[in-house]
């Protein structure tokens, strides 16, 4: 595998409405663990569509890891032009910072939003252009990642295609580990 698509829920689907929400830290840690494993397996390119939420947080992880793994690259393939036009200023700034740090940026349809067909095309395109999918997903709460998974599972029936899930259990484990590390009494070591 050389190319992986990173995705998951939009921030509001997770009940995250602040860039300082503690849950973002756990999501980033989970993606960092998986991305490091993928780098060890030979993955060089990480693809996102630039959607608010998990995709941008995962992109921040890739950008951070480029400092120690300069051979990895980030591509942002937006479903349509100016997808950030209706976002809040803080989200637009974060998005533009990621675009500036990305190694490749393009728009799949090369025109502004026209309808949901552009989003379906985005899912198909990113799955087609990658060797696998790393997705934050809860089977009890399908949400937006289910559209990627549907396309990925169809491809998987035709040919080898790697699908890796980060689950709520993974995030709980990271949160518990973090709490244990915070509660260690240094004086008693």
From Swiss-Prot:
Gene3D superfamilies xrefs: 3.40.50.450
Alphabetical list of InterPro entries matching this protein: YspA
Cystine bridges: none
Superkingdom, natural source: Bacteria
PANTHER family with a match to the protein in the record: UPF0398 PROTEIN SPR0331, UPF0398 PROTEIN YPSA
NCBIfam families reported in the protein's UniProt record: PRK13660.1
Annotated family: Belongs to the UPF0398 family.
Protein's name according to its UniProt entry: UPF0398 protein BH1768
